[in-house]
Every structure is written in structure tokens, then in C-alpha cells.
Amino acid sequence: MTSSAMDNNEPKVLEMVYDATILPEGSSMDPNIMDCINRHINMCIQRTYSSSIIAILDRFLMMNKDELNNTQCHIIKEFMTYEQMAIDHYGGYVNAILYQIRKRPNQHHTIDLFKRIKRTRYDTFKVDPVEFVKKVIGFVSILNKYKPVYSYVLYENVLYDEFKCFINYVETKYF
């Protein structure tokens, strides 16, 4: 990479640094993961749906146990209930992923979450996007309790349209 290319991107890099989530002391996040998260947030902002829900979600995923227990935010309290949904849905897969993470803590893990497909009465299939996003949020929340760097799993597994449905659900329920 040439220095001129670096100079051209300097304002963008500085903007990403200032917008980056502050991590707990001693933890670090892979720049590729931050790029993935920032791209998703920028896409959401460009599509003009509420980025405040995304900010609340990102903050929730970085909160420690004491902060979660002392929160007054109803949205975060709802996000906390998603962990049990993830355990019920993914069960042994949660344990398998946690085992892999403990076994190789410094390795980047590719985590693909499956969707439960429901058969309609017209013999077609559908996935409830809101329920799927809830389960992914719960799954990521469980992973982040072990090490708070797994937020990228949310953005790698959830499509824009699914995320939009979830945002609409939260906005309708709380705003």
C-alpha cells in the first residue's frame, strides 16, 4: 500500500476509529471484524432505518454482567431474554462452538447458524426473520460472555431484510 493511498483514506480511518466501540481493557478486536460491523452499520444508515436500535444492540453485546443486571432499558432487558431462545434452538451447537473457542482462543472462527424452516399450508417454506434474528442475538450474546469479540457473527449470519424486519419489530414495540 502506498503512502498516497493511505493519505486518501485517512479521514475515513479516523472516522472509524472515533466511531469504534470501546472494548474492555485487555481485549482487542480484529480490524476485519470491525470493518464488517462498520460496513453493516453504514449500510443500515444509508437505507434510512433507525441506527439507534443497532447502537443499543451493539452496546448490549459489549455489556458485562453487572451492567446487564443494573440496566433500566426495556430494550436491553428484552435482548437478555434472547439467550434462552438461542439455547433452546441451537442447544448442542452452542456448546460445540464454545468448546472450539476454548480450544483455539486466538483463531478466527467461522460460525454459520441454521434457520428453522416452517412449512406453510400451501406446501411452501418460510422463515420468520424476527425470530431468527432474536436467536442469533442470543447466540452472539452467549459467545460475547466468553470473550467480547464475536459481534461479527450477528452481521455475518443475518441478511439486511431480516435485520430490517427485526428493527421494525423493536421500533413498533418500544417507540
From Swiss-Prot:
<keyword id="KW-0899">Viral immunoevasion</keyword>
<dbReference type="InterPro" id="IPR022819">
    <property type="entry name" value="Poxvirus_Bcl-2-like"/>
</dbReference>
<comment type="similarity">
    <text>Belongs to the poxviridae OPG036 family.</text>
</comment>
<keyword id="KW-1113">Inhibition of host RLR pathway by virus</keyword>
<keyword id="KW-1090">Inhibition of host innate immune response by virus</keyword>
<keyword id="KW-1048">Host nucleus</keyword>
<dbReference type="Pfam" id="PF06227">
    <property type="entry name" value="Poxv_Bcl-2-like"/>
</dbReference>
<dbReference type="GO" id="GO:0039548">
    <property type="term" value="P:symbiont-mediated suppression of host cytoplasmic pattern recognition receptor signaling pathway via inhibition of IRF3 activity"/>
</dbReference>
<keyword id="KW-0244">Early protein</keyword>
<comment type="function">
    <text>Plays a role in the inhibition of host innate immune response. Within the host nucleus, inhibits activation of interferon-beta promoter by inhibiting IRF3 activation.</text>
</comment>
<dbReference type="GO" id="GO:0042025">
    <property type="term" value="C:host cell nucleus"/>
</dbReference>
<keyword id="KW-0945">Host-virus interaction</keyword>
<protein>
    <recommendedName>
        <fullName>Protein OPG036</fullName>
    </recommendedName>
</protein>
<keyword id="KW-1092">Inhibition of host IRF3 by virus</keyword>
